[in-house]
Each structure stands twice: as C-alpha cells, then as structure tokens.
C-alpha cells in the first residue's frame, strides 16, 4: 500500500518542509496510534513533545534518505505546534526512529513507549508558517492541538 493512500486526511495533517520532506501529524489519540503504528515505516523519524499532550508526528524517510539536522528540527517544531506547549517558548521534543516506537498491550490510545530517544529543543512555528507548510490536500486549517 502506498503512503499516499495510507494517510487519510481525516486522521492526519500533512506538511511539506524544505528539502521535499513530508511530515504527518495525528489529530486524535486514536489517530496518533494509526500514524505511529500503521503508517510509520522503521526508517521514518517519530516526534512528540516530552511530558505534555500532543500529536505524534512522523518525518517520512523516502528511499532511505537521511534527513539533516534542520529537517529534524523543523519536524520537531511541528510536533511542538501540535501540542499543549504551543505557546511555551522553547519546547523539548523527543525524537527517535519509528522502529523504536512500541505500544504495550492494553494501554490507552495515543500511549506508546520509545527507545533510543534524542531530545531537540525548538520553538513552535507561528500559525502563518504552519499554513505555508500545509499540503494542499489538507488545506482546512485546524487551530486545535
């Protein structure tokens, strides 16, 4: 199944960042599980704000490309924006390869365990910047985290 069809716009928001990288953000707890556990491939990068509710975010690694630090920071900033830390200044965001994201049996939707975490500190983008990165198929802008 190709990723174009696996990312239902009702379940995730899609962005494109410089370098042609695609970034997906889950909309609800159940959508976060879908993005993190069904859409994600092992080499993708996974992001979530540390200790604060928010979206699970994926930086899609197409054709085994390696994102540079700037791409990782931009995806982390998208995770910061889609969290309750949106207005919190400098935000710590956990980042790891999707292969290190697992779900324990019986845990609630949106709850995952991660290994091999890297923490990036980023400022959430302004809403105008988020609109510029938004992919056309998902143009209906939603202000909720």
Regions found by a protein language model. Name each.
Residues 1-145:
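Duplex nucleic acid-engaging cores and interfaces of nucleic-acid transaction enzymes
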